[in-house]
Amino acid sequence: MHDPFAMRPFFGYNAGQYLAHWLTIGEREGARLPRIFHVNWFLKDAAGRYVWPGFGHNARVLAWICSRVGGEDNARSTPVGLVPREGALDLDGLPSVSYSDLFSVSRPFWEKEVRELRGYYEENFGEDLPKEVMEELEALEERVKKM
């Protein structure tokens, strides 16, 4: 399910218009845009085990996010966005957690992700999906194809 913040059931009006509203926020005079980070707390390895231990360890991710917002250059660029540089996220005391498992960018995974997002958009937004959102998905798809 592609439902960031689990908000889809609570949209009080057309979901496409809801997204379009959020896209206009940066157009306001003096707008201070939020920094947006994506975290997949539920990523699983090939054996079906969660890659990240969760719970209190999530504070480690939040610490990295805060340092990023504070201007620290602790990320590397990938076709899907910025991820922590190796060593930038505190993994001390987590012997079963692998940096490469957390931050590898797999072409098959992202090809599937793009297909699923496209289906989600079609099913939930149809023609009401703002063109900017589809343009971002198409740009992501192109970057994934070049991996």
Q: Which residue ranges define each predicted feature?
A:
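Conserved NTP phosphate-binding and transfer environment spanning the P-loop NTPase/kinase superfamily
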Residues: 1-147
